[in-house]
């Protein structure tokens, strides 16, 4: 699964909107929109990853309880899986 798929899955499971996630996380709605559409993904070391996991966990408490660590693990794993090895190979070949 890609980052956007996991983010959308948790928003759906928590029955939350992008606006609620933005308000809870402090991340702008436009950035969340880009994350949700896949137009942008955070760097694996970005504080947005932890912020999103924490915020989704907080939002889950209004409906179902989702563990922050589980969310964080899924989000970071998806970013590791998105690495473009073909692009790296092409860049190295151009050196």
Label for each model-derived stretch:
Residues 1-20, 24, 50-53:
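A short, Lys/Arg-rich alpha-helix, primarily the initiator
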Residues 11, 36-40, 60:
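Short amphipathic alpha-helical interaction patches enriched in hydrophobic/aromatic residues
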């Amino acid at each position: 699964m890609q980052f956007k798929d996991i983010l959308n899955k948790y928003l759906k499971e928590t029955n939350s909107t992008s606006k609620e996630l933005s308000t809870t996380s402090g991340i702008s709605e436009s950035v969340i929109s880009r994350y949700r559409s896949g137009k942008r993904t955070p760097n694996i070391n970005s504080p947005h990853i932890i912020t999103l996991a924490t915020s989704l966990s907080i939002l889950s408490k209004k409906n179902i309880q989702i563990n922050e660590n589980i969310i964080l693990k899924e989000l970071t794993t998806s970013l590791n899986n998105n690495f473009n090895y073909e692009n790296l190979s092409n860049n190295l070949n151009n050196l």
